[in-house]
Amino acid sequence: TYGDDKDVIALEINNEPHHSGPRASVADYIRRMITAVRSTGWNKPVFYNISESPSYAGVVAAADIDGVSFQWYPTGLVANRTLKGNYLPHVDQYKIPFGDSLPLFRNKAKMVYEFDAGDVMGSYMYPAMARAFRTAGFQWATQFAYDPMATAYGNTEYQTHYLNLAYTPSKAISLLI
C-alpha cells in the first residue's frame, strides 16, 4: 500500500478542489475525507489544497490536517510562446496566501504541490524560486513536468512546462541547485 511505501512521505487529499456551498458542508466533506484516509491506517502527514478555493481558507485551516498545499505559477501558464525578458522580480517573494490573516495556518506544514516558471526557458528561475520557498517557510516543493522521453523533445504533455535533462539540461540542473 502507499502507506507502507517508504518513498511516499505524505498525501494531499484533493488536488485543486473548487468548493461551493455552505462552509459547514465543506468542513464536513474535509473531515470525512480525512477520516477515510486515516481509517486505512495511514499515519503519514495529510495535506489539503487551498489554491483554488480561497474563500474556504478558514475551513481548511481549521481542519484536522497536518499541512496545507499551494501552487505557484508566477509567470502564468500557456503563453503559447517563450517569454522573453527578466522574470526574476516575479519570483522574488512567495507570500503565503492567508498567512497573515489566518493564524491556524502558521503551525501547519506547508508544501508547494506544483510550480513552474511557465514558458521561461532560462535556467535562472528555479534557484530564485527555491529561495522564495525557503524564505516563506515551505518544507516541500514539487516541480510540474511529466513528459516521457519518447516525446520530451517536443514538450507535448503540457506545453507551458518544458523541463527535462535531455532537452533542457541547464534548466534541469538549475532545479537541483
Where are these regions (language model features)?
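Surface-exposed amphipathic alpha-helices with a cationic face
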Residues: A27-W42, G99-N107, D116
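Substrate-binding cleft of secreted/luminal carbohydrate-active enzymes
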Residues: D119, S123-I177
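Structural preference for beta-strand elements that scaffold enzyme active sites
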Residues: D7-E12, N43-F47, G67, A109-V112, ...
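Active-site beta-loop-alpha junctions enriched in small/polar residues
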Residues: I13-E16, S51-S53, Y73, F115-D116, ...
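Active-site groove signature of glycoside hydrolases
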Residues: T1-A24, V112
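Glycoside hydrolase catalytic-domain groove-lining segments
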Residues: G58-D119
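Conserved, mostly hydrophobic/aromatic
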Residues: L11, V37, V68, F133
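Short, acidic/polar
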Residues: I50-A61, G122-A130
